[in-house]
C-alpha cells in the first residue's frame, strides 16, 4: 500500500510539473526563447515578442515569413495579443512560486521534493527517504492527502474557536448596546426618583399645612386667653385701685371717723374681689390698716403672675409640636407593615411564637394539624396574616447566624400541596441562603449574590404598583437584589426558616420592627 501511495504521489507531481512546463513553452518567444514581451500575433497565428519579430523582418520590404512555419504574408501585420500577455504574467508567477516551493520543500539530505508525509515521525519526506531504511516500515502518504487530513482536523478545531468567536462577537455587540440601555435605565430611575420626591414633597407640604394650621390655632387660642386674662387683670386692677383710694381716704380721716365704718368698707370690697371673708377682722389702729393694704398689694402681685403662667403654657404648647424631622418619620412609618405570621398557613413542622413574630423548624411534629387548603404541606414555610394588593410596604426579618433560610413574597394562587419549584414563574420571589455562605435570588436560573457582609437582618421593600421587590442588608445598609415583575394577584410575605441542620440553624426567623423606628 505504501508503494502504491508512493507511485500515486510521484505521478501527481510529474503531471503537475508537465502542465507547468507546457505553460512555460506556450508563454515563450520562439525567437529569443524567453518569456514573451509585448506579445504580438501575425497572420499565420504564431506569437512573438514585438521587438523580436521587428528585428526578424528588419531588412524585408515584402513577403514577411513566419520564423516558425515559414508562411509568408504580404504585409507587416502585427496585432497585440493582450490575453497572451496576461497568461505570460501568470506563467512567470507560477514559475516563481515553483522555484520558491522547490527551494523551501527540498529534502535537506537528498535535495528532492518533499512530496510525502510520514505519520510516525510527523514530518514531510521525499521519495528516497520513504524507501530508505529509516521510513521503510512507516506509514507514508502523499503530502496532499496528509494536508487534506490535517486540514479536516484543523477544521474541527476551528469549529469551537468560531463558536467562541461568535459568542464573543455577540457579547461585544451586547456590551456595545449597554450604554444605550444604561442611559434608558438611568433616565427611568431618574424619573422614578423625581416622582418619589414629588410625592414626598406633596406629603411634606400636606404635613406642613397641618402643622401650620395647628400652630395658628394654638396661637389664636393663647392670644384669646391672654386677652381674657388681660381684661380680667384690668378689672382686678381697677377694683384694687378703687379700694386703695377708699382706704387711703379713710387713712386721712380722724381716728374716730376712720374706725367708725372701716369694717363695712373692707367687707363690701375685699370678699367680693378676692373671695375671702374679713368679718372677723377688726383693725384696731392705723398700723392694722397698713397691714391690710400690704396684703392687698401681695394679692395683686399673685394675680399678675398669670401672665407668666400663660407664657409657660405657650412654651408648653410649642414643645408639643413635632421636631423638624417628625413629619418625614411619620411619612416613612406609613410604609412599615405590621407583619405577623398566620398559623393557618404554617407547615406542620414549623412552630410559631406566641406573638406570631418568630418561626422555627422542628424535626418532630408536635401535634397533628388539619390539612386546610391554605396550609403548606410540602414546602416548610409560613405566610403572613395579611397580604398586599397595592401600595408600598417594608418589613425586616432577623436571620442572625442561621445557615439556611429564605424570605420574600408569593402570590395568592401558588400551589401549597406537593412538590414545587419556588421561582417567579410559579409565583415566588425570594432571596435565600444555604450551606452557610451561598446567597442567591431564586430566578431562572438562580442569580448568585456576592454579599460582602453577612446579614444579621434582612429588609424587604415591596412597591406593588412599580412591580419591584427589593432586599436590603440591614447590617451594613447595602442593597442585595431587586426583582422586577408585573404583580396581578395578592402578594403574601413568605418565611422559610430552613431545615434544621444541628444547632447552627436551630434559631428562628424573627420579624422585627425596623431598627430606626424602635
Curated annotation (Swiss-Prot):
Query: Which Gene Ontology BP terms does the record give?
Result: apoptotic process; innate immune response; mitotic G2 DNA damage checkpoint signaling; negative regulation of canonical NF-kappaB signal transduction; negative regulation of proteasomal ubiquitin-dependent protein catabolic process; negative regulation of ubiquitin-dependent protein catabolic process; positive regulation of apoptotic signaling pathway; protein stabilization
* Entry keywords, A to Z: Apoptosis, Cell cycle, Coiled coil, Cytoplasm, Metal-binding, Mitochondrion, Nucleus, Transferase, Ubl conjugation, Ubl conjugation pathway, Zinc, Zinc-finger
| Zinc fingers classed as B box-type: ranges | 102-143
Query: Residue ranges of the B30.2/SPRY domain?
Result: 319-514
Record keyword Hydrolase present: no
Q: Where are the zinc fingers (RING-type)?
A: 29-70
One Gene Ontology term, aspect cellular component: nucleus
Copy the pathway line from the protein's UniProt record. Protein modification; protein ubiquitination
Output this protein's name: E3 ubiquitin-protein ligase TRIM39
Species of the source: Homo sapiens (Human)
Q: Which gene encodes it?
A: TRIM39
Amino acid at each position: 500500500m505504501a508503494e502504491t501511495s508512493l507511485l500515486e504521489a510521484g505521478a501527481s507531481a510529474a503531471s503537475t510539473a508537465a502542465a507547468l512546463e507546457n505553460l512555460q513553452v506556450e508563454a515563450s518567444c520562439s525567437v529569443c526563447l524567453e518569456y514573451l514581451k509585448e506579445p504580438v500575433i501575425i497572420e499565420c497565428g504564431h506569437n512573438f515578442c514585438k521587438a523580436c519579430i521587428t528585428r526578424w523582418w528588419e531588412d524585408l520590404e515584402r513577403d514577411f515569413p513566419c520564423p516558425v512555419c515559414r508562411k509568408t504574408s504580404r504585409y507587416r501585420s502585427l496585432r497585440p495579443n493582450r490575453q497572451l500577455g496576461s497568461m505570460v504574467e501568470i506563467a512567470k508567477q507560477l514559475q516563481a512560486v515553483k522555484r520558491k516551493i522547490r527551494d523551501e520543500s527540498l529534502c535537506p539530505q537528498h535535495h528532492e521534493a518533499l512530496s510525502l508525509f510520514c505519520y510516525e515521525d510527523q514530518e514531510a519526506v521525499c521519495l528516497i527517504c520513504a524507501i530508505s531504511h529509516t521510513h521503510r516500515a512507516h506509514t507514508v502518504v502523499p503530502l496532499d492527502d496528509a494536508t487534506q487530513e490535517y486540514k479536516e482536523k484543523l477544521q474541527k478545531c476551528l469549529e469551537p474557536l468560531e463558536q467562541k468567536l461568535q459568542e464573543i462577537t455577540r457579547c461585544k455587540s451586547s456590551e456595545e448596546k449597554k450604554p444605550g440601555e444604561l442611559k434608558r435605565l438611568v433616565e427611568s430611575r431618574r424619573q422614578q426618583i423625581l416622582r418619589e420626591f414629588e410625592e414626598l414633597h406633596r406629603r411634606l407640604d400636606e404635613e406642613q399645612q397641618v402643622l401650620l394650621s395647628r400652630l395658628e390655632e394654638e396661637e389664636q387660642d393663647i392670644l384669646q386667653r391672654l386677652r381674657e386674662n388681660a381684661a380680667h387683670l384690668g378689672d382686678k386692677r381697677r377694683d384694687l385701685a378703687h379700694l386703695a383710694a377708699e382706704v387711703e381716704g379713710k387713712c386721712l380721716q380722724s381716728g374716730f371717723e376712720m374706725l367708725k365704718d372701716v369694717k363695712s368698707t373692707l367687707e363690701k370690697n375685699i370678699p367680693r374681689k378676692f373671695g375671702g371673708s374679713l368679718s372677723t377682722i377688726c383693725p384696731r389702729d392705723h398700723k392694722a390698716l397698713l397691714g391690710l393694704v400690704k396684703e392687698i398689694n401681695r394679692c395683686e402681685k399673685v394675680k399678675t403672675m398669670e401672665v407668666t403662667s400663660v407664657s409657660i403654657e405657650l412654651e408648653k404648647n410649642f414643645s408639643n409640636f413635632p421636631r423638624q424631622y417628625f413629619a418625614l418619620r411619620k411619612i416613612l412609618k406609613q410604609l412599615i407593615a405590621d407583619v405577623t405570621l398566620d398559623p393557618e398557613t404554617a407547615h406542620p413542622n414549623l412552630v410559631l411564637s406566641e406573638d406570631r413574630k418568630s418561626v422555627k423548624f422542628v424535626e418532630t411534629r408536635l401535634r397533628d394539624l388539619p390539612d386546610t387548603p391554605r396550609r403548606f404541606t410540602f414546602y416548610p414555610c409560613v405566610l403572613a396574616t395579611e397580604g398586599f394588593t397595592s401600595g408600598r410596604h417594608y418589613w425586616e426579618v432577623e436571620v442572625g447566624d442561621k445557615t439556611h433560610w429564605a424570605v420574600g413574597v408569593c402570590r395568592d394562587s401558588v400551589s401549597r400541596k406537593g412538590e414545587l419549584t419556588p421561582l417567579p414563574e410559579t409565583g415566588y420571589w425570594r432571596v435565600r441562603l444555604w450551606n452557610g455562605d451561598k446567597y442567591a435570588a431564586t430566578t431562572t436560573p438562580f442569580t448568585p449574590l456576592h454579599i460582602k457582609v453577612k446579614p444579621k437582618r434582612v429588609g424587604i421593600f415591596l412597591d406593588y404598583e412599580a412591580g419591584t421587590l427589593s432586599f436590603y442588608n440591614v447590617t451594613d445598609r447595602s442593597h442585595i437584589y431587586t426583582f422586577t415583575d408585573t404583580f396581578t394577584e395578592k402578594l403574601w410575605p413568605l418565611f422559610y426558616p430552613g431545615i434544621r441542620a444541628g444547632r447552627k440553624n436551630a434559631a428562628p426567623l424573627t420579624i422585627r420592627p425596623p431598627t430606626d423606628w424602635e
